[in-house]
Amino acid sequence: MLFRTRVRTRNAHVRNTPKKSVGWYTGSVTTTVLDSIPNGTGPESSPTQKRVLLLKPRGFCAGVVRAIDIVKIALETFGAPIYVRREIVHNRYVVNELAEKGAIFVHEIDDVPDGQRVIYSAHGVSPAVRDRSKGRGLKVIDATCPLVTKVHIEAVKFAKQGYSLVLIGHRDHDEIEGTLGEAPDVTQVVSNVAEVDALKVPDPNRVAYLTQTTLSLDEARDIIHALKEKFPNIAGPHSQDICYATENRQVAVRNVAHNADLVLVVGSTNSSNSNRLVEVSRNLGTIGYLIDNSQAIDPKWLQGVSTVAVTAGASAPEILVEDVVSYLRQNGYSNVEEVEVMPENVRFGLPPEIVQAIGGPGGAEAVPVR
């Protein structure tokens, strides 16, 4: 049975709604307030009954949906092969599925034959990559997430204004590689508070910071605080760079972790935002694991566990969540309760290369409302 829970902070109440379908479940749906549910219990459940708390929002963000759609539409419109630089999104299931349809994933532009069509991944690319593509006559389709593009634009703006840039993020991530390439001569990357102390800049009064879009909110906050301590006049982005979906999924885990004995995050190991969800859970004292699918679940993890919270990183498809929940059902977790922490209705338009090819109307890029 599936119950549905919305987290509210005021006017706690329980509202019963008619039987309906929620995602891939059908059953009685109950809307209630999470804070009114004691740990290990829920509507029509007992402290000893095994249950799953299915977090919402979870899974695909608007940028990931857009990137995957771009590859699929390109294959349907232009036919295979379509080359894609790096993984279109950081999820092996998604990449393998697109490869079966005819997408060819390459590490660098140099691996694409001259004159062929290539798609840039959602994580963005540096100007140097764009220049190489142009020099080799490649037909480029840009699937960079608009929120990543926003960070690139900010980097260029600050660099032109004479600022030294501090880019907060993980050096080995594709997104950082692309953003760093916008102003490599004036940009330094920091991954933790300790690295802030070692920063040296020509003018401490002309420093600006930017962040990777998939960081932990807590991690970014601590580093930004350290930067402001070191550079009191430091400038920052007009609005925070961390993606709305990254934030929403972390907030969901933060709200539910104390009600769970175990948190399972569906996502690939190279997914930054998925790894951050595990960190959020563990930092709150609840055991958390990152899993690609149900086959990665160690049965020992479930010993003595009555409540399992399940979520998914922004690049993990819902079919993998279904797989995990089905596994848990088969292992006695028959009570599945969907916990909706906040609504999420962000959409991004397709790039002009795709819009023109399919002859559809253009669409302005949507932005999340905070």
Positions of the model-derived regions?
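Low-complexity, intrinsically disordered Ser/Thr/Pro- and acidic-rich segments
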Residues: T5-T9
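Intrinsic disorder/low-complexity segments enriched in polar/small residues
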Residues: K20-S21, S45
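Secreted/extracellular small peptides and ectodomain modules produced from precursors
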Residues: V22-G23, G59
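Short hydrophobic alpha-helical segments enriched in small aliphatic residues
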Residues: A12-T17, T26
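The feature marks the mature, well-folded catalytic cores of soluble enzymes
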Residues: V29-A312, E318-R370
